[in-house]
Every structure is written in C-alpha cells, then in structure tokens.
Amino acid sequence: MGSTPVRMPKLAVAMSEGTLVEWLVGEGDAVADGQALYVVETDKVEAEVPSSTSGVVHLTGTPGETYPVGAELGWIEAGP
C-alpha cells in the first residue's frame, strides 16, 4: 500500500499560492477518485479540488492558511 500526496494545485498560469478555504471531508474519511476534497481560493477564483485517487484521507493543511503551489496539504492512503 502506498500514499498519494494532496497538494495545492496550480489553477492558473500566474498562480503562485492559494488559500485553503475549507476541507469538504474529515480526517480518516474514505474518499473516492474524483470526490471533492477541499476548496481553494486565489485572487481570481474559488474552486473545489477533487481527489486524484481513492483511499483514506489524512489532513495536515489548516483552513484559512495560504500555501504555495505544490505544498502538501495532506495525503490519501491507498485502501485495500
């Protein structure tokens, strides 16, 4: 079993950071591939970000905090 990082996405060419507005899932929740995980806000857009895989999610990012593109906000542990 492995894990997949949950990262701050690059939603626009000029985007260098984004704010984690809220988690749409809880610590330890089972998530499906494509399920909305969290909301990101930039100076131009607010968007839901989907999971890239299924498994159990672990959250490390704090809502209200700003993170650079690529920063790890948590990870998804592959399920059985």
Question: Model-predicted segments: where are they?
Answer:
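Mobile cofactor-carrier "swinging-arm" domains
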Residues: 1-80
